[in-house]
Amino acid sequence: MKRGILVALALLFAASGCGYRLESGTARFTDPSVRIDVSPFANRSTTPDAGAVVAARLREELRRSGFRGTFGNIGPNYLVEGRVREVRSDVFSHGADRFSLENRLTLVVDIRVVEVVRGGVLWKESGLSETASFFSGADAQYTEANRRAAFEEIARRMAVRLSQTLRVLL
């Protein structure tokens, strides 16, 4: 029994001496020389700044999740192109007065990530969506403030999803 353990330990030490080691697959993600161009996303929705907000949240989330490279459109290694296809609001529940009480805001995004040097598409996805609820009332400012907060939340959630995928890709 002891002999089997000693043989197993000897094999482990021999394998570690050969130069093999476990390493994270995200070495490029943390490489400070990597440049990513995350331009404002094209906006096909009725929300005026939707494309710019989603791209800004994506840059923030990439930094937060450990990206150490730089952002810029001069000499990038990777190009992130996106399009906000729609931001729609649907009535989710009605109050006693038959007016909407709770609404559901949905963000739909298309994204494409290109490796500039090789010219290949690393990732392309259409119809990614995130949803958040918000309350509405008789006061238009109250409703619009809640709608904006819901939009900021779904933009943040979308950025987290995109950032997690980019972390795996890079």
What are these model-predicted stretches?
Residues 16-59, 63-67, 71, 140, ...:
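A structural "domain/chain start" motif
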Residues 38, 82, 109-111, 128, ...:
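A structural signal for short, well-ordered beta-strand segments
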Residues 24, 65, 69, 75, ...:
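Surface-exposed short loop/turn segments
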Residues 5-8, 39, 47-54, 75-83, ...:
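A generic short-segment signal for beta-strand/edge and adjacent turn/coil regions
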Residues 46, 50, 101, 146, ...:
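Conserved acidic
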Residues 112-126, 158-169:
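Short secondary-structure transition/capping segments
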Residues 1-17:
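Sec-dependent bacterial lipoprotein signal peptides
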